Swiss-Prot record:
Protein name in UniProt: 4-hydroxy-3-methylbut-2-enyl diphosphate reductase
Source organism superkingdom: Bacteria
Annotated binding of dimethylallyl diphosphate, by residue: H41, H74, H124, S226, S227, N228, S270
Binding positions ([4Fe-4S] cluster): C12, C96, C198
HAMAP family per record: IspH
Catalytic class of the enzyme: oxidoreductase
Family: Belongs to the IspH family.
One Pfam family from the record: LYTB
Amino acid sequence: MQIKLANPRGFCAGVDRAIEIVNRALDVFGPPIYVRHEVVHNKFVVDNLRQRGAIFVEELDQVPNNVIVIFSAHGVSQAVRKEAEGRGLKVFDATCPLVTKVHMEVVRYSRDGHECVLIGHEGHPEVEGTMGQYDASNGGAIYLVEDEADVAALEVRKPEALHYVTQTTLSMDDTSKVIDALRAKFPQIQGPRKNDICYATQNRQDAVKELADQCDMVLVVGSPNSSNSNRLRELAERMGTPAYLIDGAEDMQRGWFDGVRRIGITAGASAPEVLVRGVIAQLREWGASEEQELEGREENITFSMPKELRVKAL
C-alpha cells in the first residue's frame, strides 16, 4: 500500500489562533478558563485543553461571575456579547477573523435596512452566531437556506434590497449551486465582494479532489461535528472514491484496506498533524510504504493575538 498526503491539510490560521488563545489564557491567568462551545470542533484538541483546565460550556449561564470566558472560533451572536458585557465577564474573542468578516457584512446590511440570506447548515454554531448579527429593528430580515429546495421555498420582503453571505466552511461546489438558484429567483440579489468560504476551506477541498483522483481510498482525519471535515469526506465520495471520517488511528479497521493499493490522507482544518502521524504509523504497521506528500498550495497566513495574550519579546 502506498500513502499519499494531501497538501495543505490540518490546522488553518483561525484554528491555530483560537487554540493559542486558550493556551495563553491558561498560562497567563491560570485555570479555570471558561470557553463557550468547543473552541474548535476536534475531540483531541478539546480533551487536551480540558486537561489543562479549560471548562467548556454551551451557554453563559453556566459560567460563574468574575471569571475569564473565551468565545470559540465559530463566533457568537450580538445577544451573547451583550450578555457577557452585562455580567462584566472578561472576554477573549477567539472568533476566526474570516468569520468576523461575514459578521460585519451582516451588520452592515442590517444597519442599512437591507435583507440578507445566509447559506449554511442549521444548528451549526457559526450559523447561529452569524444569524445573531442581524438587527431586524430597521425593518429587514435575515433568512437561512441550505440547498436549492430551500431557495425555491424562500419568500423575502425586500427582493430589491437583498444580499447573501455564506458559512465559511461549506462545499464550494454545493454553495455555487445555491448561489445560482438565488440569482435566478432574485435577480437583484448581491453577494460579498469576496467569497465568504475561507481560503483554508477552499485549499483543502482542492487538495482532497486531487487526492481522490489519485487514490483508491481517502481517510479524512477530523471529528464528526467538524463541518469542513465532513465536506472533505463528501467531496472524495462524490468523485467516486470511498472515504472515511476518523478521529484518529483508533477508528480504523484493518479490513477497510483489503485490495487497496493507494491510500490518501487529509485532515480537516481543526485536526492536528499529530493525529495524521498516528494514522500513518498504524498504516505502516499494516504494511504501507513510506508516505508521499502531494505538491499542493503553500499557506503562510497568520492572525494576531489579543493584546493581553501576546508574548513579549525578550
